[in-house]
């Protein structure tokens, strides 16, 4: 996530990053220019928006309507799909071919799910991408939906989400319930807790992370969590503030909360460079 934040900052020209090998992640050591003298404060994703109450001037994190309503911030910048990574549903490797996983993904990418989300979400590029993914997928026929039966080997599914992602899955229990499943939503307080719970088996599936974060977690922890396809681009990084309403108002020396993990920090740095606020090493 730290890498994500750095790429975000590069994309708006607030930083310049050095060039690194493809597939590598940016760190703060890769900054070569910091023309706005930004003070980067590394925080977990659940602390960044709340920190704007006093500790920091700006925050970078995933944008959602629920977060904006909860923290009442100004949206200064929403980064486009060239920076964002695909969000993934994750299961344990041994479950990836199970019928219940296929059923879950059909529900998650169904037209009904997309329509429910778009009814209550301000239209953004992120949900247009989700809609396009579904347009290119094989839609569920109504007759198939009604006749579908739950996987006899597993009818109760524990779905783990972090707080900011509960918004995106509230229709799934209803839809899968029509097929004979019981979906229990388990709220977990951090990304690490959500992946640890999945690896240990206290939940069956989770949704909250992008692909680089999942791969980095597997590598660091020796876990075998599997990203299910299709990948869904359901959230975009943003720069938010309670003090300022536009990027132009942000003074030199401002403090900005960025990700405290490598994958998202790298993107944050690149985004800051894209808006001219940093320059990263080659």
Give, region by region, the residue ranges found by the protein language model.
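A conserved helix-loop-strand patch within extracytoplasmic ligand-binding domains
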Residues: 1-16, 111-114, 228-281
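Short helix-initiation/N-cap motifs at beta->coil->alpha
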Residues: 23-50, 185-196, 282
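Ligand-binding "clamshell"
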Residues: 53-55, 67-79, 216-228, 243-244
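A bilobed periplasmic-binding-protein/Venus flytrap-type ligand-binding module shared by bacterial periplasmic
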Residues: 84-103, 235-248
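Extracellular/periplasmic juxtamembrane helices and adjacent flexible linkers that interface
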Residues: 105-153
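Short, polar/charged alpha-helical segment
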Residues: 162-187, 192-193
């Amino acid at each position: 996530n730290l890498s994500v934040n750095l790429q975000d900052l590069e994309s708006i020209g607030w930083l310049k990053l050095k060039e690194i090998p493809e597939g590598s992640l940016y760190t703060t050591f890769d900054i070569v220019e910091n023309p706005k003298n930004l003070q980067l404060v590394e925080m977990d994703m659940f602390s960044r928006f709340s920190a704007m109450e006093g500790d920091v001037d700006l925050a970078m994190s995933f944008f959602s309507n629920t977060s904006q309503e909860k923290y009442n911030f100004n949206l200064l910048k929403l980064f486009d799909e060239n920076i964002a990574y695909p969000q993934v549903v994750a299961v344990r490797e041994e479950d990836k071919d199970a019928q219940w996983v296929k059923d879950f993904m059909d529900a998650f990418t169904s037209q009904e799910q997309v329509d429910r989300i778009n009814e209550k979400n301000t239209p953004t590029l992120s949900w247009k991408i989700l809609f396009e993914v579904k347009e290119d997928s094989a839609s569920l026929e109504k007759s198939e939906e009604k006749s579908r039966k739950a996987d006899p080997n597993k009818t109760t599914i524990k779905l783990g989400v972090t707080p900011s992602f509960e918004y995106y899955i509230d229709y799934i229990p209803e839809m899968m319930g029509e097929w004979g499943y019981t979906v229990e939503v388990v709220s977990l307080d951090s990304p690490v807790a959500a992946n640890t719970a999945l690896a240990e088996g206290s939940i069956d599936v989770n949704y909250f992370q992008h692909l680089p974060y999942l791969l980095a977690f597997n590598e660091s922890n020796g876990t075998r969590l599997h990203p299910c396809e299709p990948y869904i681009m359901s959230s975009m990084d943003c720069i938010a503030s309670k003090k300022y309403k536009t990027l132009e108002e942000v003074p030199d020396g401002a403090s900005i909360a960025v990700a405290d993990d490598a994958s998202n920090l790298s993107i944050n740095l690149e985004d800051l460079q894209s808006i001219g606020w940093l320059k990263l090493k080659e």
